[in-house]
Every structure is written in C-alpha cells, then in structure tokens.
C-alpha cells in the first residue's frame, strides 16, 4: 500500500513540476506520449488487426461448459 502511495505521489510530482516552471498542462501531457503515437495511427492499427466477421464466424467455435455446438450443417453436394 505504501508503494502505491509513493508511486502516485511521484507521478503527481512528475506531472506538476514542469507546471511550476511555467509549462502548460497540455504540453506536459503531450510530453508523456511518444511523438509517433497519434489517434489515427492507433485506429489504423486496431482496424488492420481485426479479422473480418466472416473469418471469425467460420473459425471460432464457442463452447459453454465443455459443450461445443456441431460444425455448421452443409448439404451433401458441398454447397452452402
């Protein structure tokens, strides 16, 4: 518990110390984030990693209490 308290205190000092030297809060917060991290970059990386819904539906089988549903029913001729 004491460690968490001191971590919190040090974080507050780390953020507020530049403010006491005349810095602006927005500049201090921006200084905590790397320059190459932008909302657009984060969104693009999330979209590129997400598989399409059809791939997820065809590959993921959800099991409850170790009871899995049978694979999707297919017609004998191999269509649909």
From Swiss-Prot:
It comes from Conus mercator. Belongs to the conotoxin C superfamily. Consomatin family. GO terms for molecular function: toxin activity. Its main location: secreted. The keyword Secreted applies. Residues 1-22 form the signal peptide. Moderately activates human somatostatin receptors (SSTR) with a preferential activation of SSTR1 and SSTR4. In vivo, does not cause behavioral changes in mice within a few minutes of intracranial injection, but causes a progressive loss of movement thereafter. Four to five hours after injection, mice recover, even with the highest dose tested. Shows antinociception and antihyperalgesia activities in two mouse models of acute pain, most probably by acting outside the central nervous system. The modification 4-hydroxyproline is found at residues 69-72. This peptide is an evolutionarily optimized stable analog of somatostatin. In addition, it adopts nearly identical conformations as in the somatostatin drug analog Octreotide. As this drug, it contains a D-Trp at the same position, whose synthesis is a common strategy used for enhancing the metabolic stability of compounds in drug design. Consomatins evolved by gene duplication of a 'Somatostatin and related peptides (SSRP)' gene expressed in the snail neuroendocrine system. Residues 23-57, 74-80 form a propeptide. The modification D-tryptophan is found at residue 65. Keywords: Cleavage on pair of basic residues, D-amino acid, Disulfide bond, G-protein coupled receptor impairing toxin, Hydroxylation, Secreted, Signal, Toxin. This is Consomatin Mrc1. It comes from the Eukaryota. Disulfide bonds join 63-68. The cysteine framework is C-C. GO terms for cellular component: extracellular region. It is found in: Secreted. Expressed by the venom duct.
